[in-house]
Amino acid sequence: ERPVEMIVVKNDGTEVRELLLLDSTRVWLQLGAEITYPKKFPRKHRPVHLSGEAFFDVSHDPSRPFTVSTTAVEIKVLGTRFDVNSAIDGAVTEVALESGSVALHMPEKENESVVMKPGELAVATLSDTSISVAETNPYIYSVWKEKELVFRAQPLGCIMKILERAYGIDIRLGNEILERTVYTGRFKKSLPIEEILTIIEMNTSMRYRINADGSIDIW
């Protein structure tokens, strides 16, 4: 057989990179992420390999499942939207499912798989070959690819997690009542985080402080 020609795309730039695969699947690559896939997908499946973080909007094709493999886990889908992060030295892979359904299995446990539902986060750990699943807000995990931050009556606790991911900053919120306080707003992600926090502060009872190490305390 003729060897399969592979395409390797690495995001060495300073902005999120968007790809359109031949099957109409859309992929957003986070900075430093690398994806490898065949120049032409086989007839029965659509395999890609990921190192780093990416968001997938997979085109629906029941006859050819789409699979994303990382060092820790393989994710099998038919058509769905989800975020995969294997950036943490490859030994841990996080999968946040926005819509559709995916099945995860680890190479060491070929006959065991975990099926995810929308609104869940799965964490696959290579060291003990385990997959844990918990409920989450998938937007927290895919916000890095958006140009705008949109909050619709969301609790401040969730908003701060989104801002942490979007800006790569440690935010500590030590007030349980404030965590549950809902806020609605829309911000361009090009805005400095101080501007966003100041606007939220003006419309809620929240106060914030930026520390010398860049972390932020909320009370």
What would you call each of these model-derived segments?
Residues 1-219:
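A residue-level detector for the "anchor" residue at the start of short, highly conserved motifs
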